[in-house]
Amino acid sequence: MAFCISYVGALLPCSLSTRTKFAICHNTSKLHRAAYKTSRWNIPGDVGSTPPPSKLHQALCLNEHSLSCMAELPMDYEGKIKETRHLLHLKGENDPIESLIFVDATLRLGVNHHFQKEIEEILRKSYATMKSPIICEYHTLHEVSLFFRLMRQHGRYVSADVFNNFKGESGRFKEELKRDTRGLVELYEAAQLSFEGERILDEAENFSRQILHGNLAGMEDNLRRSVGNKLRYPFHTSIARFTGRNYDDDLGGMYEWGKTLRELALMDLQVERSVYQEELLQVSKWWNELGLYKKLNLARNRPFEFYTWSMVILADYINLSEQRVELTKSVAFIYLIDDIFDVYGTLDELIIFTEAVNKWDYSATDTLPENMKMCCMTLLDTINGTSQKIYEKHGYNPIDSLKTTWKSLCSAFLVEAKWSASGSLPSANEYLENEKVSSGVYVVLVHLFCLMGLGGTSRGSIELNDTQELMSSIAIIFRLWNDLGSAKNEHQNGKDGSYLNCYKKEHINLTAAQAHEHALELVAIEWKRLNKESFNLNHDSVSSFKQAALNLARMVPLMYSYDHNQRGPVLEEYVKFMLSD
């Protein structure tokens, strides 16, 4: 009698739509797909397949009018940057607290890259005068919380003890704070920067969240919407451009510089849209010329989806166009190889495929089926080409580091295939150790690290090994959220290879809700570790990489906000916002 189990294939972080289950039977050697759900994004240019570049060009509204508008933009654009810089400088000189609010606004609206020098000077002055808990005693909850968050975000240590000033004799936060909505919101935001062991920040998060949730019903509509958005998407753990749309409304007419800053943010968005649209055309052209989706007709043919990852990860650095396009190629191959392991290969073929990647040897693919052989050889060609581009741009060849990530990824996929063939679930710890590799996070971040010119021989350059703990935390966050999203949206029957079911196998009396809560607790722990690792990587050369890596983790709440049709309307809305009017 054949023994069959239902198994969820490697749920890559790139799986923006819900993955389907695969039935693996012991009396066959193939992995059979039940049915891949097509992409349900209702986004211009994404129809679940690859439109030719000319059609994609039309779908993205790149017409003569929009291009002519772009040609006229720079004159006003530069003037608006200068005007904003002047206003920021004035506030930095005359109003320490409002200058911090101004800095926060530039971050939330995604225009801070224009004012790095001015922002650094404001933060330097503020840190010199406010870092002492004694001095913080004379400031409001909102002011101290904002100061704390901005300093930690920018690598300046402030003790969590500054919040002791807001506790009463009972050791609990003071009762009068319950009426300070603005202060509580900022306290909640500040608590997202906590490290492991900072109990007072755990208390601050719980206190502020409970009070704000309890008060939502009695708030006016605009305030309720604003507070609700911040509770759902705290700034530190979310994508700035996504949360910035709501913050634009929050600014209102409170500050005289608000209108100027909003106008600059809109101009910035126009520039970014133009760049992203052009990059998507490049990606579509590359994908069509590659032609692998024609050989692997069951594989996911979603270049738009591939590109979305690079667009969001590098959303803060519009100048890194080449890096976004090149990184998208790596994302595409994670999808393809995942599909090779989930759909095409027998276990014996998957072993040969993995050995070929491990050897990085074209001839080792000779015994593979033609479609698998073509995929493997094209992977080697593409990554060798990426390494050559990095060498030409930055003066060093990272091929060994890049090869290592692909070897590890394929080996992790192979472990999954063997687990599936055995019909048994691994322990929760075994699962998580392997799945954080099969998530694809290491591949993406190592490629990004090298594409940004890090890890070379230049003096003072950070080493790739210095980022391993940071990458590990991001990979675990993704894997756990991926499994949580799958559990919610795929109606798992308890026999699939998710962390939740591996954990429940070891704790047989645990309910699904308790297992879910346990996974969320692990996510919270990894965010604390990620905060600490990010803070410790306080080196000028790595700041852009660090921000991009955090953006990878920040995609999680966008990815797993599914509706009843298993679409991701929140992410869909964000991508539409970034690509079209």
From Swiss-Prot:
Obligatory cofactor(s): Mg(2+); Mn(2+)
GO CC terms: chloroplast stroma
Record note on cofactor: Binds 3 Mg(2+) or Mn(2+) ions per subunit.
UniProt keyword terms in alphabetical order: Chloroplast, Glycoprotein, Lyase, Magnesium, Manganese, Metal-binding, Plastid, Transit peptide
Glycan attachment positions: N27, N206, N319, N384, N465, N509
Pfam families: Terpene_synth, Terpene_synth_C
GO molecular function, one term: magnesium ion binding
Induction (UniProt): Circadian-regulation with highest levels in early afternoon and lowest levels during the night.
Reaction catalysis annotation: (2E)-geranyl diphosphate = tricyclene + diphosphate; (2E)-geranyl diphosphate = beta-myrcene + diphosphate
Tissues expressing the protein: Accumulates in flowers; mostly expressed in both upper and lower petal lobes, and, to a lower extent, in tube and stamens.
Binding site for Mg(2+) 1: D338, D342
Physiological role: Contributes to floral scent emission.
Family: Belongs to the terpene synthase family. Tpsg subfamily.
Protein name according to UniProt: Tricyclene synthase Oc15, chloroplastic
The organism of origin for this protein: Antirrhinum majus
Taxonomic lineage of the native organism: Eukaryota, Viridiplantae, Streptophyta, Embryophyta, Tracheophyta
Gene name tied to this protein: Oc15
